[in-house]
């Protein structure tokens, strides 16, 4: 898996101050996506053990509320497979921090349903490691900049999956 960016103090993508990881790779290609450069699975840098350690160190300060995953698309199966071991490390080291994930996919159709576009052998485990999932593709016609933690009115937030 590659990643496009790590923000070590982000206040736009979840409650409180967060560390944000933008993964690479997305097959959705939403119209007017704010991060279209991350559609390419080869964009950015490889997500290595050293990268994991960098993110884990950034999570250490007490003022950091948690980790947010976005992209690209964290729920692309190859990204899920790469992220599950890392998320276990986050949970072990920082059980008090929460984990948010933004996905253009939908929980019920794409992640939980057999044959869903993002369902794979690690999806249930991946979801169990999240505290908040914000699902639903960005829809330009539903764009609403007044919404908190969403770019359009269609995404749904799920907590404690």
Where are these regions (language model features)?
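Hydrophobic pocket-lining residues within nucleotide cofactor-binding pockets
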Residues: 26, 74, 138
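Conserved small/polar residues in nucleotide/adenosyl-binding loops
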Residues: 159-160
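Conserved Radical SAM active-site core
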Residues: 1-3, 11, 17-18, 35-115, ...
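A generic structural signal for alpha->beta connector loops
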Residues: 96, 129-130, 154
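C-terminal substrate-binding/active-site "lid" region of AdoMet-derived donor-dependent transferases
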Residues: 145, 149-150
